[in-house]
């Protein structure tokens, strides 16, 4: 760079735009995969009911794993419009609706765990064996325990399922059900709609691949070699 003669070439090199890497696919489960995974905990045991309620809440609310870990008993608001109060990044709170089945699980869980006392409203909603608030790692471990049984039912279930894949799955399922990106943005707590648009891009690509796999392409893209057509060449020459 100290030689003026090489400066022009150096400028050309740094002016070459970087190759844009393709956007990675959003890792998520299909509705069938999610349904099978959520059905794995043993409903006949206290631990199984706790795990099922935890995973169903994670999926139904589309919350981040830390938001799930931070839930307090008071954050489950029942009534005519049942909602879950989530505390996200920067301490910002948002309310997401609870569907009927998820609400029923939470209500039974709160009663079974004796958390329905007024003085327990600030208790952590989900705790470990030591009655301490579950950590992100603890939640990840709980989910991992049910992957192998789920794969025995449906081998297509991924070998690794993370808590964040529950959030991705909920967003994709909402989008595929026709819910607008604006609502999904607010539901997930995104500040920028561009963050939410990754789901739309992923869904479009999945549809394209599905169409390619399902239907033969009937359009023949091969064109005749016009350079061998003498009459066409004569006509083109006459246009000069």
For the regions a protein language model found, what residue spans apply to each?
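Conserved catalytic core of the tyrosine transesterase superfamily
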Residues: 1-240
């Amino acid at each position: 760079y100290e030689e003026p003669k090489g400066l022009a070439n150096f400028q050309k090199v740094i002016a070459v735009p970087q190759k844009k890497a393709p956007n990675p696919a959003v890792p998520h489960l299909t509705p069938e995969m999610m349904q099978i995974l959520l059905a794995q905990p043993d409903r006949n045991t206290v631990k199984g009911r706790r795990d099922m309620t935890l995973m169903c809440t994670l999926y139904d609310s589309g919350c981040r794993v830390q938001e799930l870990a931070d839930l307090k008993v008071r954050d489950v608001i029942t009534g005519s419009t049942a909602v879950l109060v989530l505390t996200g990044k920067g301490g910002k709170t948002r309310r997401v609706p609870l569907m009927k089945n998820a609400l029923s699980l939470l209500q039974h869980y709160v009663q079974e765990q004796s958390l329905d006392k007024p003085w327990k409203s600030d208790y952590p909603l989900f705790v470990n064996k030591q009655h301490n608030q579950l950590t992100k790692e603890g939640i990840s471990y709980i989910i991992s325990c049910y992957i192998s049984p789920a794969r025995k039912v449906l081998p297509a279930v991924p070998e690794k399922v993370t808590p964040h894949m529950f959030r991705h799955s909920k967003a994709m399922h909402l989008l595929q059900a026709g819910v607008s990106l604006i609502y999904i943005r607010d539901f997930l707590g995104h500040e920028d709609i561009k963050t939410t648009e990754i789901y739309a891009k992923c869904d479009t690509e999945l549809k394209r691949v599905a169409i390619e796999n399902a239907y033969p392409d009937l359009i023949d893209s091969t064109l005749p070699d016009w350079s061998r057509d003498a009459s066409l060449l004569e006509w083109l020459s006459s246009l000069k």
